[in-house]
Design a protein with these regions (language model features):
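N-terminal Rossmann-like NAD(P)+-binding domain of SDR-like oxidoreductases, especially those catalyzing
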Residues: 1-138
């Protein structure tokens, strides 16, 4: 991706991975905006990165609309998390990710984003090492 002067939103941009992504995008000439609620992301991760930081909750439609407005590319990294054990024992709390994802996709599309890059989690993979049964493959 040619990042030169692209307007790029990184949701969850103050996280460990998100902040490194922001740093690389800025080095490649992108104009970076971060949408972050700082529940687990750290302000210090952004201290040395020339970016615009919007603090709010992406579950709030008005914040999601404002955060995505004018962005050409959206890297969607924001999510509730906690690892496999957390997901197994807190399924309702984790279902908010589906709402959050849908909201980011909807507003990014409405506001004219050219690309959305969605980063999921290693938690989506099964914990067993068993192979998928051939009967499940179509």
């Amino acid at each position: 991706m040619n990042s030169n002067n692209k307007k790029v939103l990184v949701t969850g941009g103050a996280s460990f991975i998100g902040s490194h992504l922001c740093e690389q995008l800025v080095q490649r000439g992108a104009n970076v905006r971060v949408a972050e609620n700082f529940s687990s992301g750290e302000r210090g991760h952004l201290a040395h990165i020339e970016c615009e930081a919007f603090e709010g909750d992406l579950l709030d439609p008005s914040f999601c609309d404002i955060a995505t407005k004018g962005m050409e590319v959206v890297f969607h990294l924001a999510a509730d998390h906690g690892g496999r054990g957390y997901i197994d024992s807190h399924p309702v709390e984790c279902s908010t990710n589906m709402v959050l994802d849908g909201q980011v996709f909807r507003y990014a599309h409405r506001n004219g984003a050219e690309k959305i890059i969605f980063a999921s989690s290693g938690c989506v993979y099964p914990t067993s090492r068993a192979l998928i049964a051939p009967s499940y493959i179509h």
